[in-house]
Regions:
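Conserved, charged catalytic cores of large soluble enzymes
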Residues: 144
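Active-site neighborhood of divalent metal-dependent phosphoester bond hydrolases
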Residues: 52-55, 61-126, 130-133, 141, ...
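N-terminal donor/sugar-recognition subdomains of glycan-related enzymes
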Residues: 1
Length: 165
């Protein structure tokens, strides 16, 4: 995904919210987030905290929030698809998120949420007044073998797919 900003809009990047809806709302209030701003959530919306549904709906309220998939988001989507769609999509680590969500959302809504996650990019190319940035929720786990193969980028940990260059 490519985003270009050619004005004086505020651009914020935050990651690792991990289900903390109240903290996220306080952050938006603190930065006085408004319709002219852009917020990029750089992965890991889900897992660990206890308010995933509230956080999800809070994010959906804004047209000017962009989301990048993080490893926890990928795991949540995979678990939902396996549990409610009855098909295996890859490995995942199960935290508390799906158990909390299924108390409040229908199976159809759970699958829609998984689809929403999977539609999000792994990175965003951001240009602000001519300066270029690439934002990704990534950590490299480089072994000597991985370092030798310059055609591959390893994002996240071993649960992520390899992005071939």
């Amino acid at each position: 995904m490519d985003i270009t900003i050619d004005d004086n809009r505020n651009v914020y990047v935050v990651s690792d919210i991990h289900n903390y809806a109240d903290g996220f709302k306080r952050l938006l209030k603190k930065i006085q987030f408004n319709e002219n701003d852009l917020l990029i959530i750089d992965g890991d919306i889900f897992d660990r905290g206890d308010t995933p549904v509230e956080l999800y709906f809070e994010i959906l309220r804004y047209h000017n929030i962009q989301v990048i998939q993080g490893n926890h988001d990928v795991w949540v989507a995979r678990q939902i698809i396996e549990q409610f769609g009855h098909r295996k999509t890859g490995e995942y680590i199960s935290y508390n998120t799906v158990a909390i969500m299924e108390k409040r959302l229908t199976p159809v809504d759970m699958l829609r949420l998984a689809e929403w996650i999977q539609e999000k990019p792994y990175y965003i190319n951001l240009t602000i007044n001519g300066r270029k940035y690439q934002i990704a929720h990534a950590q490299t786990f480089l072994t000597p073998e991985r370092m030798l193969d310059k055609r591959k980028i390893y994002m996240g940990d071993w649960h992520y797919e390899i992005i071939k260059c």
